[in-house]
Amino acid sequence: KTQKGKFPIKSDIHATVKAIQDTGINVHANYMFGFQDDTIETMQQTLDLALDLNTEFVQMRYVNVLPGAPMYNDFTEDQLPKDWNAYSQYSYEAQPLDTKYISGKEVLKFRDHAFQTYFRSQKYLDLVKNKFGKKCYDHMLIQPKVPLKRKLLEEQKVA
């Protein structure tokens, strides 16, 4: 069964990331939102960890269940996206699955919030400026200002 990763002792992951960074290696971390047991609170814990670790590169994604994946059979056909565009993380049609506790819409909204929060955090921007220079820093000031358009997050217009 696929589940959210858990580190037995919080300091282990912190010490590991620091040890890697201390050797001059840039860390690329991947964070997933929308596991079946996720709530807004558990996703916030994941974001808090990301902000605390402050790695050089991150991906913030929602859980996607593709045909052939072990988790795919845990869902009924009506729970899965009907169109391949819905599987694309950054597409207008992106459609995360509901968790046991929150809707796919809430997962997508949180994922996009997490992305904006991380890349706008001063701690991260300082890391970029100090490690990669002003040109990269200036780019990072612009990049998160372009929000993704999401069909699922558009307000429904009342006739």
Question: Model segments located where?
Answer:
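C-terminal non-catalytic accessory extensions
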Residues: 138-159
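A structural motif corresponding to the C-terminal lobe/cap of the Radical SAM core domain
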Residues: 1-135, 158
